[in-house]
């Protein structure tokens, strides 16, 4: 492939744990070209992003100015893609900026509110620019969610437990929220009360979301990303669990999303929509 036919990719949050994995994956992809790396950690400013990611020099320095890199991405012959793994406080403005420049966002940062998602969807529609918001890039997690939807036909009681490393800023996780949304969109109400319940400590039973589904969040060092969906019925428990042991497991989904977003003209939410 010539460089003119490669997908130009900007990684925002390039020095973070997920950002480094994305840098390595894009650098190894035959149909992509890393054109920019952004991170606001001053310890990495000016360093070669390949050296930071551990894949060797790529001659792409880490900068702390997203706007200038978006401008650079628009100068390529093929419309660029921005992969965002940053922070819930900044992701909304990052995505709006990318769309405004005609750069297609692939968003792995969780924490966007329903209102923000709606606004970004409207903005992407008006700009006819593809945008993917993916709470979890793992194929295994998509399969778990699909299995949970199928199981919900036979169980009326369900709770979700999500466990992550203690540097994750938002709770509950976007993946757990997405799972609850998939279950709550099936036209049934879960967990009918069996006794009069009292919480002696507020929040002891977890966060209540749509259709009476509860999510419990755990944050501990030593964890990466894990989720259980537990169904209960008289005399039995059915547990679905997904465990991440290495962040490289997300890269197949990230690369697929980069390729797919170039074909979209609107915002799409969830990896299952593009599989």
From Swiss-Prot:
A GO BP entry: lysine biosynthetic process via diaminopimelate
Keywords: Amino-acid biosynthesis, Cytoplasm, Diaminopimelate biosynthesis, Lysine biosynthesis, NAD, NADP, Oxidoreductase
Protein name: 4-hydroxy-tetrahydrodipicolinate reductase
UniProt: (S)-2,3,4,5-tetrahydrodipicolinate binding residues: 165, 174-175
Gene symbol of the encoding locus: dapB
Active site: 164 (proton donor/acceptor), 168 (proton donor)
Lineage, highest ranks first: Bacteria, Bacillati, Cyanobacteriota, Cyanophyceae, Oscillatoriophycideae
CDD domains named in the record: DHDPR_N
GO MF annotations in UniProt: 4-hydroxy-tetrahydrodipicolinate reductase; NAD binding; NADP binding; oxidoreductase activity, acting on CH or CH2 groups, NAD or NADP as acceptor
Superkingdom of the organism of origin: Bacteria
Pathway: Amino-acid biosynthesis; L-lysine biosynthesis via DAP pathway; (S)-tetrahydrodipicolinate from L-aspartate: step 4/4
